[in-house]
Curated annotation (Swiss-Prot):
<comment type="function">
    <text>Specifically catalyzes the N1-methylation of pseudouridine at position 54 (Psi54) in tRNAs.</text>
</comment>
<keyword id="KW-0808">Transferase</keyword>
<protein>
    <recommendedName>
        <fullName>tRNA (pseudouridine(54)-N(1))-methyltransferase</fullName>
        <ecNumber>2.1.1.257</ecNumber>
    </recommendedName>
</protein>
<comment type="similarity">
    <text>Belongs to the methyltransferase superfamily. TrmY family.</text>
</comment>
<dbReference type="InterPro" id="IPR029028">
    <property type="entry name" value="Alpha/beta_knot_MTases"/>
</dbReference>
<dbReference type="GO" id="GO:0030488">
    <property type="term" value="P:tRNA methylation"/>
</dbReference>
<dbReference type="InterPro" id="IPR029026">
    <property type="entry name" value="tRNA_m1G_MTases_N"/>
</dbReference>
<dbReference type="GO" id="GO:0005737">
    <property type="term" value="C:cytoplasm"/>
</dbReference>
<dbReference type="GO" id="GO:0008757">
    <property type="term" value="F:S-adenosylmethionine-dependent methyltransferase activity"/>
</dbReference>
<feature type="binding site">
    <location>
        <position position="150"/>
    </location>
    <ligand>
        <name>S-adenosyl-L-methionine</name>
    </ligand>
</feature>
<keyword id="KW-0489">Methyltransferase</keyword>
<keyword id="KW-0819">tRNA processing</keyword>
<dbReference type="InterPro" id="IPR007158">
    <property type="entry name" value="TrmY"/>
</dbReference>
<feature type="binding site">
    <location>
        <position position="183"/>
    </location>
    <ligand>
        <name>S-adenosyl-L-methionine</name>
    </ligand>
</feature>
<comment type="subunit">
    <text>Homodimer.</text>
</comment>
<dbReference type="GO" id="GO:0008175">
    <property type="term" value="F:tRNA methyltransferase activity"/>
</dbReference>
<dbReference type="Pfam" id="PF04013">
    <property type="entry name" value="Methyltrn_RNA_2"/>
</dbReference>
């Protein structure tokens, strides 16, 4: 399983935004939508072994978590408007501290970064930062990872402190700063290659002899 967390510092936490203006009315929700697509879509299908967690910290009620489960997800297309619509529907629910299903494969709850980190107890956490250790030196060792990325604002000092206290390893996908969705694509590529070298089909299945 691969879990990917994206922190949206300005992402709106109510559903009253326009799907025609995701960058403006929704607080750069377009960035999160692109991350959802990069994390989940293949050329002719979807990564069923991936979960995406969007941490929304914008107004009016900062601290909501929307989870996209690749295994159960339906009604998602690769365009930003499609993922934006599923996010909007989730935010229109009456949200509590417990997971509430919005649509198949999409769940919403109240929570913050510590809430997410607690849910990943026992997992290996990786925090992406430009000056981190190159993933190419680690990709063959990575199993059942959780990756945490910031949005266009990066990660705050307090968030970084929480990540490091939780034991997150700082890694990088390259020497220059990239958009979050591009980082996700590169992460998948490195892990896919490592899995293929181990005789696995990305997704956790073993290649049969002769295939």
């Amino acid at each position: 399983m691969r879990d990917i967390v994206i922190i949206g510092h300005k992402a709106k936490t109510s559903g009253d935004f326009s799907l025609n203006d995701l960058p403006g009315s929704a607080g750069r929700m377009d960035i999160l939508c692109r991350c959802v697509s990069s994390a989940l879509f293949l050329s002719f299908g979807m990564r069923r072994d991936v979960n995406v967690h969007l941490l929304l910290l914008g107004e009016p009620e900062p601290g909501k978590i929307i989870r996209f489960e690749g295994l159960h997800l339906r009604y998602l297309n690769p365009d930003e408007r499609s993922s934006g619509s599923l996010i909007q529907k989730a935010l229109q629910k009456t949200v509590t501290e417990k997971d509430i299903r919005s649509t198949p494969g999409v769940w919403v709850r109240n929570g913050d970064l510590n809430t997410l980190l607690a849910s990943f107890e026992g997992r290996t956490l990786f925090y992406l930062r430009e000056d981190g250790e190159d993933i190419r030196g680690l990709d063959r060792e990575i199993r059942d990872p959780v990756f945490i990325l910031g949005d266009h604002m990066g990660v705050t000092e307090e968030e970084e402190k929480q990540l490091l206290e939780a034991g997150a390893k700082i890694i990088s996908v390259g020497p220059i700063s990239l958009h979050s969705n591009h980082c996700i694509t590169l992460l998948h590529n490195e892990l896919d290659r490592a899995e293929a070298e181990r005789g696995e089909i990305p997704g956790g299945e073993k290649l049969r002899a002769g295939e």
